[in-house]
Amino acid sequence: MKSLEIEEKINKIKWCRRSNSSHFLLSTNDKTIKLWKVFDKSLKVVAENNLSNELTPSGPVGGGGVPRPPPRSSFKDPSLLKLPRMTHHDTVVAAVPRRTYANAHAYHINSISVNSDGETFISSDDLRVNLWNLNIQDQSFNIVDIKPANMEELTEVITAAEFHPTSCNWFMYASSKGTIKLADMRQRALCDEHSKRMPPLWYECVYDDGFFFNPLIVFEQEEDASSRSFFSEIISSISDVRFSNDGRYIVSRDYLTVKVWDVNMERQPVKTIPIHEHLRPRLCDTYENDSIFDKFEVVFSGDAENVMTGSYNNNFMIYPTDQEKDTEIVLQADKSAFKAKKVGVPTPMNRGANGKKNGSRSTSPVGPGSRMKKETDADQIDFNKKILHMSWHPYEDSIAIAATNNVWPLPPSHLYLHLIVVRGNIN
């Protein structure tokens, strides 16, 4: 047997829904999931004690004063003694682990997602998805298992999984083949019939919540056979998948594109946004430096009118989900973003001779703290500076970006001017 050291890192963090004044979150590394309680901890110091009246005029102890020996008669009477008095000094954020969920995954965990019922969550690795109860740490249920009897027959792995934001029975998981599978736990205990090449069940079910649902929905866009290459399977692998807050839309990210799907139309995405189309001729280079395996996240805005994802050179982009709009905002996570006094104007993506968007941008005014033109020359791209992780506030236009070793929070006042241009409220 070999002892394998588990790297000290956090793969995913998810907030639990609040049921009281306490805050809880789930975190996971490659093998272990933990539930944390997060709270404000009050730090107190001694403000008054028995020596408080026996100090030099220069100040109390700890503030520069030097205590002098008390008179011999100071504490002869017990009534003169008093308990130390504590006062509030500072408030810090503290976290304590409440539960540990371990020994359920044979492969590295890539996703966790908390259910809308506030009681359960799922975790996924390369081949399985497990269902947990937040209150039970030593037992889980396997709801997806795509491991073949012979591992040589393995053709895909699970890359991400997420619960539906409002219906506690639905969840989806994405694969390295570029497919998204939407499953309903009310159908059966193991929700992977399509993964095991079972015959499809062409029927719809109606439930009390009013949803019509085919339990075997697979979202997949057929690939053009003429454009298939050695890298096709790698670049089609989905690195992240999210529901919109209302559960109507799904957004997915692969290496070259972002796709927006309607849950009622699985045959093709309602919008495909080119992200790294300028890197297609340089896929050999990205393969050699392993950049082609970078896992970029994608997020919806709270109203689902925009999506945001990251790129290289510490750039991140915001796009409208409306099919009729092709405007793009490119921003860069650097210190100048917080010194900006004016905002650049986003420009539409250029179209090639065939009328399709080619992912390049026309020149546009650039305000301090913004980059309205994404670098399209692969030789000028710094592949070590990349935006992989991000978050968008569910109720306001505030975002948080992780760039190298820094977190960049952008408040509504900075983001608002960019978004109103995308939403078409100003010319």
Predicted regions and their residues:
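WD40-repeat beta-propellers
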Residues: 33-39, 124, 129-135, 180-184, ...
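C-terminal transmembrane module of eukaryotic multi-pass membrane proteins
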Residues: 293-313, 388-391
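General structural concept
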Residues: 1-28, 35
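Blade-level signature of beta-propeller repeat domains, shared across WD40, Kelch, NHL, RCC1
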Residues: 389-427
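Conserved beta-strand element within WD40/beta-propeller blades
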Residues: 24-29, 121-124, 171-175, 250-253, ...
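Inter-blade linker and blade-boundary elements of WD-repeat/beta-propeller domains
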Residues: 1-7, 40-109, 130-162, 187-237, ...
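Loop/turn segments within WD40 beta-propeller blades
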Residues: 14-22, 112-118, 161-168, 241-247, ...
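Sequence/structural signature of beta-propeller domains
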Residues: 30, 115, 126-128, 155, ...
